[in-house]
């Protein structure tokens, strides 16, 4: 990692599954307070904010999670529950509409959703790249498989210099071999497990 990022503090969390919380306000307050008490430079959320529907990310949850504070902000990627179909009435509540709702509400909270995108962070004259990989709904039925078919990583890493330190955020850890095989993911953050 470049010298300018020595001591750079990243707090990563994932798999909140809002629809499964028994006492959402208390649990989300505890999560937000814990994260903020660590004084992170950057917060990275690695997917599965909701369990079934985008509407689980309601005003109360948005207020609490929107209170996360870090100088470099909060970035996120989507997970299989954010992008998947886990209910019988998926015709009435299409997965794509729910995913769009989750992404829109995260942006409304001030989170930067990285959808197969790379951004650059600068500190002390040094730079690193931060790539976020969206959950591919085509992998929905393979989400727990140990090996995945080749993923198209080109768009996410397009133009990223090989020599630049790269942090990759991805929901499913099974993509690590492919990411590393492309020469990226010096640090890979994932959830799902």
Residue ranges and their predicted role:
Residues 4-193:
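Soluble catalytic domains of enzymes that build or remodel membrane lipids, polysaccharides, and related
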């Amino acid at each position: 990692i470049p010298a300018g990022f020595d001591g750079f503090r990243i707090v990563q969390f994932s798999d909140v599954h809002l629809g499964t919380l028994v006492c959402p306000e208390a649990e989300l307050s505890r999560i937000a307070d814990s994260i903020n008490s660590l004084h992170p430079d950057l917060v990275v959320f690695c997917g599965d904010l909701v369990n079934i529907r985008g509407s689980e990310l309601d005003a109360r949850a948005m207020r609490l999670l929107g209170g996360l504070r870090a100088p470099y902000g909060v970035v996120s990627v989507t997970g299989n529950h954010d992008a998947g179909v886990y209910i019988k009435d998926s015709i009435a509540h299409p997965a794509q509409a729910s995913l769009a709702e989750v992404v829109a509400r995260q942006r409304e909270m001030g989170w930067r959703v990285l959808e197969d995108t790379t951004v650059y962070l600068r500190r002390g004259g040094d730079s690193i790249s931060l790539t976020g990989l969206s959950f591919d709904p085509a992998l929905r039925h393979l989400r727990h498989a140990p090996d995945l078919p080749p993923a198209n990583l080109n768009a996410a890493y397009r133009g990223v210099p090989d020599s630049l330190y790269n942090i990759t955020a991805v929901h499913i850890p099974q993509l690590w071999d492919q990411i590393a095989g492309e020469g990226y993911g010096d640090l890979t953050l994932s959830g799902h497990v």
